[in-house]
Amino acid sequence: THLIKLIKQECLKENDRIYDLDIVMPGEEGVVPGVVEKMEGVEYIRLDVRKEITFDFKPTEDDIIFNLAAVHRTPGHPDEAYFETNILGAENVTAFADRYGIKKILFTSSIAPYGAAEELKTEDTIPMPNTPYGISKLTAEKIHMIWQAEDDTRELTIVRPGIVYGKGEHGNMTRLYWGQRKRYFMYTGRKDTIKACIYVKELVRFFKYRMIDNDFSGVDIFNCTFEPAFTIEQIVETMKKVTGIQRT
């Protein structure tokens, strides 16, 4: 939703079309709390990325795919669900791009391929995933890389964001807030655990900068988190300060 709004506000030209392919349609309850928002000028198509992608589509030389599909909340799903969605999804998205000659893909991966650690990670750090989510995301990255390697004019950006927070996110940050608000949050051990994160509007603005404002060829990987990263205590204290929550 944030990405579509930004594209509509700043990038859309005459005759451009936006397709939102999703398993959940506007007006329906999504995989996170709340009803999916419908926006004017967007063509919504119900689609399961785990299956072959087929719909009435006329390609242009300016087409861009933003592949955001994933099973990502962890823990919370059976192990096979991560592999089924993240790997089959990557195969079907790249097959669709190949079929229609689309040369630009942005794929949202995760910092999970690095594995659980608190040392600073760079894009050159060797991935060592230790969860089904991280393993499946790294595999999906490689599937996209194979697609790019088949034609050196293709453009692939792989983004590895940390915790994404903001309106409509309903993930870790939202649960942390409500845990404090309802008085059932407590530190289970350390207060200095690092929580690498990024604001959703900053993330989609980077998507636009990378894929729409610039042209490049090849493959690039970008970690997307604020630096320096915040600790869980810093995040909790900031939430308390701006919302007036009092802990007793």
Listing of model-derived features with the role each one plays in the protein:
Residues 47-85, 96-99, 114:
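NAD(P)H-binding glycine-rich loop region in Rossmannoid oxidoreductase-like domains
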Residues 142-167:
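Conserved beta-loop-beta element that borders a ligand/cofactor-binding pocket
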Residues 81-92, 127, 135-138, 198:
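Glycine-rich NAD(P)-binding loop of the Rossmann-fold in SDR/ketoreductase-type enzymes
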Residues 169-175, 189-212, 219-220, 234:
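Substrate-positioning beta->alpha
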Residues 92-132, 152, 157:
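Conserved Rossmann-fold NAD(P)-dependent oxidoreductase catalytic core, especially the SDR/UDP-sugar
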Residues 1-64:
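N-terminal Rossmann/SDR dinucleotide-binding element
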Residues 210-248:
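Mid/C-terminal beta-alpha module of Rossmann-like enzyme folds, strongest
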Residues 21, 65-69, 105-111, 159-161:
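SDR active-site strand-loop-helix element
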